[in-house]
Amino acid sequence: MDNDLAARRAALGWSQAELAARLGVSRQTVISIERGRYDPSLPLAFRIAEVFGCRIEDVFRP
């Protein structure tokens, strides 16, 4: 799934490890989502949107 997770994370100055800690997942999970190799579960997608203060559809595109 296409996403702008890396750009949003970078805009806030967060490392992959910091975002992972905020989400309660591993750094490898963040890397996999950013590279489009892993589609997050719906609950994780909601957490990602919440951390960035936006809607799921603002971060992820089908």
State what each model feature region is.
Residues 1-11:
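A short, Lys/Arg-rich alpha-helix, primarily the initiator
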Residues 61:
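Phosphate-coordinating loops and pocket residues in cytosolic domains that bind phosphorylated ligands
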Residues 14-32:
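Short alpha-helical DNA-recognition segment
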